[in-house]
Amino acid sequence: MQLCVALDLEKKEDNLSLLQELKGLDLWAKVGLRSFIRDGATFLDEIRKIDGNFKIFLDLKLYDIPYTMANAALECAKLDIDMLTVHLSSAKSALTILMQRLNALKKRPLIMGVSALTSFSEEEFLMVYNAPLKTQAITLSAIGKESGIDGVVCSVFESLAIKEALGKGFLTLTPGIRLDKNDKEDQERVANAKEAKQNLSDFIVVGRPIYQAKEPREVVLELLKDC
């Protein structure tokens, strides 16, 4: 299991300062919408300057009509990133075209499809998708696998079921990881790193428990032990 550190701080300088503290550790730097829109593609180069071994996860959750989404993914791939997210509900046609385009490249990032955001409660998900959360997460994940993507973004609580349905080689990335599961904030389906590993998660995403800590590096070292 691998650790992705979410760079969601208010200022670019704060994100870079955090990475300076984590230099030399085996982790992924997750750049989301806020940081990418604010700081641009050059932010990725600044991450690499701190530690060239940091792997870069561009978490943009692309969702659009097929060719628009595929073209956007191609532009992202040109930034030499290691992982990119797209929405599974964009449908099989969009995902298939996207993967055809990316597979033509000499090197492409891992493509992870978002199934159900971890901010969804069971009730909210049912209202939007008119289906039970775990059932629909597996259905969407199957569409993703048929389209050729590498894996899915899901909560810890769907990870094992997705692995059992689609095989252990189909990757799962699980956000909503907390040190204290009572500390949900804007997440609903949270778990700790040990539970993520028990449910066969390949990647975990941790943000606030790291950057709100007095000693972020110590928190990351503890998390890496659980990985």
Curated annotation (Swiss-Prot):
Catalyses which reaction(s): orotidine 5'-phosphate + H(+) = UMP + CO2
EC number: 4.1.1.23
GO MF, any single term: orotidine-5'-phosphate decarboxylase activity
Active site: K61 (proton donor)
Keyword Zinc set for record: no
Key words, A-Z: Decarboxylase, Lyase, Pyrimidine biosynthesis
UniProt xrefs under Pfam families: OMPdecase
Family: Belongs to the OMP decarboxylase family. Type 1 subfamily.
Subunit structure: Homodimer.
HAMAP family: OMPdecase_type1_B
Matching NCBIfam families: PRK00230.1, pyrF
Protein name, entry field: Orotidine 5'-phosphate decarboxylase
Organism for this UniProt entry: Helicobacter pylori (strain J99 / ATCC 700824)
Upper taxonomic lineage: Bacteria, Pseudomonadati, Campylobacterota, Epsilonproteobacteria, Campylobacterales
Gene: pyrF
